[in-house]
Design a protein with these regions (language model features):
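Residue-level recognition of tetratricopeptide repeat
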Residues: 11, 231, 500, 533-535, ...
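Structural motif corresponding to the intra-repeat A-B loop/turn of tetratricopeptide repeats
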Residues: 16, 505, 538-540, 574, ...
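Short coil turns that delineate tetratricopeptide repeat
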Residues: 34, 522-523, 558, 592, ...
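Alpha-solenoid helical-repeat scaffolds
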Residues: 365-557, 562-569
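TPR alpha-solenoid repeat register
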Residues: 494, 527-528, 563, 597, ...
């Protein structure tokens, strides 16, 4: 994606309140390109700034000085963003094409004129009922064709528009709340405003999106506005626009908004994991779906197979079992969909190469059958009922509905004739793999939002010019709960739910970013406990360490077993074995005779080279449960370090008896043999280990020369011995 480092640097100066330096650097930049930029506005800002400085130097006490300084900073920021937009178009074929495509529209554009055109379209469509029937269809097609061209021009105009003025914001709000303008047009405008504000922050566009979210009664529009203002909310700009905090705080005072933001965050994560879900469907669900049907997918399409009578004789219950597996797979897929998984992404991602999707606005249009790009297919007689039913009953986002209609002629030719005939005759109803979605479900805000997010996800993943945009699903924007604008708001009460969800999805780093956004006064025991667990698992070094987090938790609840266990483990991971031993022994005093804790005590004793004490405890644990592999593993290693090789080897023989022994057991057994001077035996085990770990990042050289180097030297081996072994294994 295009980036102008010089202009971004000037923007950062403004965000640091360095107005004077920003003016100077911006002036130098504009003078470098005098043929491309008009310096008139900058000169006016510079003169006003100089006037402010002159009054300040003379010692005048101006009560409006700070306000004027901020106003000039904002004016410069707006001018800077407009120059950034011009520069972007000069370096981007997509934005230049969008600008040129809407050039005629741009020259005559006015919001009042736009509103009149949109209202006229609604009126003209309503008046079609008065047209003679033989003229109605052609007139209808003409109206929709003209309107689609208007939509495309409007979209291109908005995504290449400069900063919005206050009066433009008010006029657009009036248009977006007007009941006389089609909701589909309003939804498209909101999407375009979102894209524009994401590319170049505009306070008025952000404010407009929040106002639409608060005031509209159209739920589809409301959900688009929600996604729009959340993705456009750039906390870094709050130093220039502190009213952003006030706007967001006001929104977060509403419980419905808090619930919707929480749902939105979870839905965004499900979109981000579409590839993983697609792989699950491909490997775990589709095989059973196909096996459970008497169909086969061939190059010629879906073929109905005759029943295998011999199979029925040999395995009379196989059909029933296959059917049960198929139904279970269907339920699993429907459950994934209900939870929020994007189950159709992989399939429909192959259907975005139609020319229809080369027009950017088409990715954001709500689905309507009269769209000139699909109307001729929608109205065809063959397979019409099948097409209409499948698009209305399945949980398809608008983008996928357009894809399905465009690909329908190909789909139709691959459907079994008998299946199609039954549907067309009303004898059967087609059902999407994810199951039918009742109208009641489709009318819920969460469903509407999920479908819109899937539209966006497809655009940012599949559109041919996607690299020209900031992808909110691949950047820090995706974890909206880490946005600093939500810090200190009532939304913090919902942070634990999102953190728990992220942890279950193995997204520890993202969970940490949410926890870090909790305000200091809200950081209690649970905060430090979870943060400690995350940092211990992720080994993240920024901010408080895992040990420090658990220590804070214990200061609040000294005898909490979870916190004490985490504290002990984190100390051990930092190789602070004596402190870890104290923590584990303290934990053992709270939970006497806990084998897991006793084993940890033994491990700490070994690392402190208190082998005899460790051995005594390990023998006790082994006596109580002789088949406990965890205990036997540590016992064998302790015996090895004590030089009791024969006893250790007997235990290793048992541990290595499994089909796939652990890498640690292979390595430690090899060390035991090597210390015993059985070089050939050690070599054999090292080779087994390397073979087993061939597809991993394991490095035996690193183990011998770095991780365990000191240990090897302590037990009589030399650097020459180590190099000879490595050379032998490499030969």
């Amino acid at each position: 994606m295009w980036k102008n480092d010089s202009l971004v640097g000037i923007q950062n100066l403004l965000l640091q309140d360095r107005l004077g330096k920003a003016v100077t650097m911006f002036e130098n930049y504009l003078l470098t390109y005098p043929q491309r930029f008009d310096t008139g506005q900058l000169i006016d800002i510079k003169n006003n700034y100089q006037l402010l400085v002159d009054y300040w130097r003379k010692g005048f006490d101006d009560p409006r000085r700070n306000q004027l300084y901020k106003e000039l900073s904002r004016r410069l920021f707006v001018l800077l963003n407009n120059v950034l937009l011009t520069d972007r178009m000069a370096h981007s074929s997509f934005f230049m094409q969008s600008y040129q495509h809407s050039s005629v529209f741009r020259r005559s554009f006015s919001i009042s004129g736009l509103k009149a055109s949109l209202e006229s379209f609604v009126t003209n469509i309503a008046m079609l009922e008065l047209e003679p029937e033989h003229l109605r269809q052609s007139r209808k097609s003409q109206l929709y064709a003209e309107h689609q061209q208007l939509q495309s021009n409007l979209f291109d105009y908005l995504i290449t528009s400069e900063a919005m003025t206050d009066w433009q914001k008010d006029e657009f709000l009036d248009l977006l709340l007007s009941p006389t303008v089609d909701s589909f047009d309003q939804q498209l405008i909101v999407s375009a405003l979102m894209l524009s504000a994401m590319m170049s922050f505009d306070m008025n566009k952000f404010h407009l999106l929040t106002s639409v979210y608060r005031l509209t009664t159209d739920e589809q529009l409301r959900q688009r506005a929600l996604v729009g203002w959340v993705f456009a909310a750039d906390a870094a700009k709050a130093s220039l626009y502190p009213e952003m905090h006030e706007i967001v705080s006001q929104l977060c005072s509403d419980e419905q908004c808090l619930n919707e933001l929480t749902e939105l965050q979870i839905q965004i994560v499900y979109c981000m994991q579409a590839d993983n879900d697609s792989q699950t469907i491909k490997s775990e669900i589709m095989p059973d779906l196909i096996k459970g049907n008497n169909i086969r997918i061939t190059r010629q399409g879906i073929v109905e197979m005759e029943e295998d009578k011999l199979e029925d004789i040999l395995h009379p219950d196989s059909t029933e079992r296959n059917m049960e597996r198929m139904e279970a797979s269907m339920r699993k897929m429907a459950d994934m969909q209900r939870r929020g998984s994007d189950i159709y992404f992989a399939g429909f991602s192959q259907m975005k190469r139609f020319p229809f999707f080369s027009t950017a606005s088409n990715w954001f249009l709500p689905f309507y059958p009269q769209h000139p790009g699909i109307a001729h297919i929608w109205n065809q007689s063959k397979g019409q009922r099948f097409l209409h039913l499948i698009t209305s009953l399945g949980a398809f986002c608008d983008s996928d509905k357009y894809s399905f209609v465009l690909a329908f002629e190909q789909v139709l030719s691959h459907l079994p004739a008998q299946m199609l005939q039954m549907v067309e005759n009303g004898e059967a109803t087609p059902m999407a793999i994810g199951g039918e979605v009742p109208n009641e479900e489709q009318s819920k805000p969460a469903f509407m939002r999920r479908m819109y997010l899937q539209n966006l996800y497809r655009f940012f993943r599949l559109y041919s010019y996607r690299s020209e945009f900031i992808n909110p699903f691949e950047s820090s924007l995706a974890i909206i709960f880490s946005n600093k604008l939500f810090n200190g708001t009532p939304l913090e009460a919902h942070f634990p739910e999102v953190v728990s969800f992220l942890m279950k999805r193995k997204m520890q780093r993202e969970a940490i970013s949410v926890l870090q956004n909790i305000s200091e006064q809200q950081r209690g025991f649970q905060y430090y406990l979870v943060m400690g667990q995350l940092r211990l698992a992720q080994k993240v070094n920024d901010g408080l360490s895992a040990t420090a987090c658990f220590k804070e938790a214990l200061a609040l609840e000294p005898d909490n077993e979870q916190a004490l266990r985490g504290y002990a483990r984190s100390l051990y991971s930092e190789q602070r074995y004596d402190e870890a031993l104290d923590a584990f022994e303290r934990l053992l005093s709270l939970k006497p005779d806990n084998r897991s804790i006793e084993l940890n005590v033994a491990v700490c004793l070994i690392d402190l080279k208190r082998y005899d004490e460790a051995l005594k405890l390990l023998y006790k644990l082994n006596y109580e449960e002789a088949d406990d592999e965890r205990v036997n593993r540590v016992l064998a290693w302790c015996l090895t370090l004590l030089g009791k090789y024969e006893q250790a080897l007997k235990i290793y023989e048992s541990l290595l008896a499994s089909d796939k022994p652990s890498a640690d057991d292979l390595l430690n057994n090899a060390f035991c043999l090597w210390f015993k001077k059985d070089v050939a035996g050690a070599e054999n085990l090292f080779r087994r280990l390397l073979s087993q770990q061939a597809d991993s990042e394991f490095s035996l050289e690193n183990e011998l020369l770095v991780v365990e180097h000191a240990l090897l030297l302590e037990h009589g081996l030399t650097d020459i011995d180590i190099h000879l072994m490595l050379d032998l294994l490499a030969a």
